[in-house]
Amino acid sequence: MSGYFQKRMLKYPLYGLIAATIILSVITFFFSWWLSALVVVGGIILTVAMFYFEYRLNEDVQLYVSNLTYRIKRSEEEALVEMPMGILLYDEHYKIEWVNPFMSKYFDKAELIGESLEEVGPEFLDVITGNDEKGIMSIAWRDHRFDTIVKRKERILYLYDRTEYYDLNKKFQANKSVFAVIFLDNYDEWAQGMDDRRRSALNNLVTSMLTNWAREHRIYLKRISTDRFMAFLTEEMLKRLEEEKFQILDRIRERTSKQNIPLTLSIGIGYKEDDLIQLADLAQSSLDLALGRGGDQVVIKQPEGKVRFYGGKTNPMEKRTRVRARVISQALQELITQSDQVFVMGHRYPDMDVIGSSLGVMRIAEMNDRNAYVVVEPGKMSPDVKRLMNEIEEYPNVIKNIVTPQVALENITEKSLLVVVDTHKPSMVINKELLDSATNVVVVDHHRRSEEFVGSPVLVYIEPYASSTAELITELFEYQPDLEQVGKIEATALLSGIVVDTKNFTLRTGSRTFDAASYLRSLGADTILVQQFLKEDITTFTQRSRLVESLEIYHDGMAIATGHEDEEFGTVIAAQAADTMLSMEGVQASFVITLRPDKLIGISARSLGQINVQVIMEKLGGGGHLSNAATQLKDVTIAEAEKQLISAIDAYWKGET
């Protein structure tokens, strides 16, 4: 600093002053020697003055810089000791060399020098030895949250205590809004047959139970119609409700059942959305999904993330009406007449229900003067379906309208109508490309609705209370024009679908099922032919026997059978094996794991109704009904699939979804 002043402020001005003094004294000497002497004296005085002031200035600057340097060093020392940031120095063996006072208060030990990080703070050691080069990392340690920065070359760890921020953020998240819509599934049906006194008593009972439940959990509840409530709560309240598995479902069902009025609830919940309108839309969408799955359950949705389900463990009561069947039939008729042609497609490896309902839709299209085509893959059929297809070959007017996916893709247009039967999952249809090519799509299914669904269908007819899709299609005939009578082969195929899905009218069979079967019989359905379709050969029998032979009981009547890793089994054989196992004493639910012809691992699940196998299969990406469900797994072995199944069963018994 002094060199700077000497160089820039003393050296050159002083030289200039001396030179000017000499020149001026020489010039004035020729005129007057005393004037020249005066100039010399003045120059000397100025030079001395400049030296003096320059010296004082330099001293003042030196003093200022010295004081400033001292203050900076002092502040650095105080910062290391007093600032609210932890500093930890460690050696090459990850032992503590020094910590500042701020950080030392977090440790239990008074003397930390020489202590191993692995013992006093293994979380810190993980940060130091980790490969993360992103800079700031967050860790949890002793009820605190720290943001950390590691300087590995200098062996320094900086820690910022963010516990207060995280606690505040956690509190903010816990208090975010949650919107719920509560629906009394079958309130109207029960209320219609009651007198005013009983209806009022039922209404008071349900309202009182829901109000007490809401008050218990600090939920705002408001009744908006006779069978609908809305509720506002927070995410913290929602978490508590999930922990208790929404016991209000069981309470309402059990309490009303004692009065011979088994009322059930469906609850749709939306959360993780700041916009209240979108939050309400999420809740309504969740409720629609809950009702589509049969009711008596809770569905929780967020904008991003997996949908969660609770309840739905009881067999749903039949709620569909003739009025709905008529409305759907008329809507389907209108869509058919507006199209140029109709294509019908079911799920891969179609069963009798798919073929029967497809032929039924084809006949409905012909009743409305439109050509219809059933899409199948000839090489991917079970033996019973092959026998049905062989019989159809005797009917030229029918067989000519059965086409492959390639033919359908070549002929489908923007005005064509595609009807998807017996499934609502895009991943399960015979040909995904055909589904994507269709502008107008109708879905008719009897499986409980899952999260995966056909995008933007123009008409949806899903009735999980029906025995089969064939039953639903049969009911639509009554409201169609009589231009074309239902033929014997269509009626027989539809009856076959009902027989297969109900296991000869023993499972999921309601009064409407018998009505549909009776109607089909009146149209000429051949029951003897149905039995011929369902006959099995010796190979099928022996394969099924081998599967049943591998049966093992896992948990409270849960029977599991597995095929060999390299032996392929058709889906029908696996399903039949599951049915056979279910007929054995002590078996409440059966699961058959096999290698399918498409190289996927398939799991067929059956139950007597006390155990909801659909919930178990949904945990593995599948679905179905309470007593009849299945799934397919990719890139796993049979042994690995069995482990996944056992985990899903364990989660089911724990009440997890």
UniProtKB/Swiss-Prot annotation:
Organism: Listeria monocytogenes serotype 1/2a (strain 10403S)
Classification via SUPFAM superfamilies: DHH phosphoesterases
Protein name, entry field: Cyclic-di-AMP phosphodiesterase PdeA
Region (DHHA1): 592-645
Location of the protein in the cell: Cell membrane
Entry's transmembrane regions: 13-35, 37-53
Record region (DHH): 342-498
Obligatory cofactor(s): heme b; Mn(2+)
Primary role: Has phosphodiesterase (PDE) activity against cyclic-di-AMP (c-di-AMP). Overexpression decreases export of c-di-AMP, leads to slightly increased susceptibility to the antibiotic cefuroxime and somewhat slower growth in macrophages. There are at least 2 PDEs for c-di-AMP in this bacteria (this one and pgpH); this may be the major PDE for intracellular growth in host macrophages. During host infection c-di-AMP is secreted into the host cytoplasm which leads to interferon-beta production and secretion by the host.
Membrane topology note: Multi-pass membrane protein
Keyword Metal-binding: yes
Binding residues annotated for Mn(2+) 2, in chain numbering: 353, 422, 446, 501
Chain segments carrying region PAS-like: 74-137
Binding locations of Mn(2+) 1: 347, 351, 422
Family, similarity comment: Belongs to the GdpP/PdeA phosphodiesterase family.
Signal peptide: none
